Amino acid sequence: FDTYLTGELFSILRQHSILKHDLEAEEFNAEHPAFVNGVEVGFSESTPLLTSLFRVRARSLLIERDPLANAAFLSGRLLGEEVRSAIKNLPKMEKIHLVGGSSLTKLYAKALTLAEREVQQHPGDDLVRLGLTAAWQFLYS
């Protein structure tokens, strides 16, 4: 069993590191080219994570990348590494089910799709309601 602090690391880098000036706070979508590029870099074991972090800074200073593209790249880079690590030892399942908030599950779904995995997304709120309803019916029926 593995778990990852990907979201925590992204938040720390975005809010408390030298990169905070190079990263936009607004959300980007999973189809953003910089996000897709970041995921692909994350899948590659040839680019170390710390090198990628420096590239975010360098892209901002030298290429004048916009902060939204930098945030999308960094998010994709971190998610790409997480997905690569997570699926490395998993058999190819028929389908991976993602449960959670819409914007985050879309990012994971895109990364998993790029890793050639079939994905189905489920809204977390709906499943919690269904689970609580089933528990109530079990207890009080």
PLM feature spans:
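Short hydrophobic/aromatic-enriched beta-strand-loop microsegments
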Residues: D2-Y4, A115-D125
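Adenine-nucleotide phosphate-binding core of ATP-dependent small-molecule kinases
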Residues: G42-S85
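Glycine-rich phosphate-binding/hydrolytic loop that grips phosphoryl groups
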Residues: R14, R77, E81, Q120-S141
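Conserved active-site and cofactor/substrate-binding residues in soluble primary-metabolism enzymes
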Residues: Y4, E8, P48, N70-E81, ...
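Non-transmembrane, aqueous-exposed alpha-helical and coiled segments at domain scale
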Residues: I87-M93
